[in-house]
Amino acid sequence: ALAIGADAAFRIDIEPDSSWEVAKYISDFAKTKAYDLILLGKETIDHNGSETGAMVAEFMDLPYISYCNKLDIDGTKATIAREIEGGTETSEVNLPFVLSAAKGLAEQRIPNMKGIMDAKKKPLDIIAVDKLGSDLELVRFELPPVKSGVKMLAVDDMDALIKILHEEAKVI
């Protein structure tokens, strides 16, 4: 991003366990900066849940538009378009807001040599988690209990079905 025109870049130095944690740290950091638009990818490379943008918006109490593939900003308003089943949905929203990008929002730009060299002079601020002032505390992270396997019965074995429903499932 620095090589194609961004003025500054920030990286929050974490190894997250969940999209919720990523969203919390992004929102805590963003609250310390001036912004009009918080732009995220449709899916994150860490968890692919397509949920980080929505959680950032919720933590910051901002409007959220997902899967945006067209964006026009005019003053304090933005017009957003996104593909939906059967057509295109167009929305208007006031700045600031959170947006998750879909394919087609921007053309990929390959940086030229001058941009790459200039990027080396621009700062990449690495933010330590303890400097964010976040109230996030991971108490526990555990997997759900393992479910029992599926039992296959012959179509005509009603006696076995009734026995399982009565003795194991306890529904009859």
Descriptions of predicted regions:
Residues 1-172:
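N-terminal glycine-rich FAD/FM-binding segment characteristic of electron-transfer flavoproteins
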